[in-house]
């Protein structure tokens, strides 16, 4: 399967879906669905939002997921604690990885900021090792930048 993703097109599609929609859940639901339909070789795509000092499950596509993640735990919690994108080629080598789906082998998590604070994260998992590249990181960070402008 061709793994090339046109992130410029993906970002424009996101802008079209969310441009005139004032509802957070609606926009995040469509964003998760867009990623699910557009990215090859993934088994989960969605969001966690910061609530009461922890990450809470928000709209997603894929199997049922962990509902709460503590800051500093797992890939998502580390992304928040370090305020940095986590590109993990092999989650089984990541200290403290939380296995919500045992089929996941690689993961990318991008922090989302609103008004200068971490709002939450975009989390994408793959059953393939080394699924995510620096190109994916840059493209998904642009995708998140669009979301930051509407949340």
Mark where each language-model region is.
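Residues at secondary-structure transition points
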Residues: 5, 22, 66, 70, ...
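Short hydrophobic/aromatic beta-strand element in the GNAT-like acyltransferase core
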Residues: 44, 109, 121
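A short, aliphatic-rich beta-strand micro-motif
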Residues: 106-113
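Regulatory sensory and allosteric helical modules in signal-transduction proteins
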Residues: 50, 54-100
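Juxtadomain coupling helices with adjacent low-complexity linkers
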Residues: 15, 126-151
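Sensory-domain boundary capping and coupling elements
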Residues: 113-126
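Intrinsically disordered, low-complexity terminal regulatory regions
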Residues: 1-59, 146-151
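Short loop/turn motifs at secondary-structure junctions and domain boundaries
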Residues: 39, 100-104
